[in-house]
């Protein structure tokens, strides 16, 4: 099921910073977002539910040390993904 991506301002800011520095990161992020739209639980994404202070959110891998934090939300009557953060493992957790 295709989902709509709803990036937060902080996600957009972080993704611009990351992709400006590194073309490989830009490509990894683009591919991960395409997979998220098609199937958020594609095995290549390693999607998992978060606990603790990030409870209610999910994380997926967008490359070796790149993670996307998101939530499943309703948007205009269908399921969407609210993109909250992107960065290295240490930056987002």
Features from the language model and the residues they span:
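Conserved N-terminal entry element of GNAT/NAT acetyltransferase domains
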Residues: 1-7
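Enriched for short, Lys/Arg-rich terminal
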Residues: 4, 13, 23-26, 61-93
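N-terminal first-folded block
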Residues: 7-43
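Residues that form or immediately flank small-molecule/cofactor binding pockets and catalytic motifs
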Residues: 10, 55, 88
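A generic structural signal for short beta-strands and their flanking turns/coil linkers
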Residues: 32, 46, 56, 64-66, ...
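A short, surface-exposed loop/turn module that caps and links secondary-structure elements
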Residues: 35-59
């Amino acid at each position: 099921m295709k989902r709509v991506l709803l990036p937060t301002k902080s996600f957009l800011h972080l993704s611009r910073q990351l992709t400006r520095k590194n073309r490989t990161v830009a490509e990894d992020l683009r591919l991960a977002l395409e997979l998220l739209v098609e199937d958020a639980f594609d095995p290549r994404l390693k999607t998992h539910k978060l606990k603790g202070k990030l409870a209610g959110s999910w994380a997926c891998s967008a490359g070796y040390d790149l993670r996307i934090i998101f939530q499943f939300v309703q948007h205009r009557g269908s399921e969407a993904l609210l993109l909250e953060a992107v960065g290295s493992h240490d930056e987002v957790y």
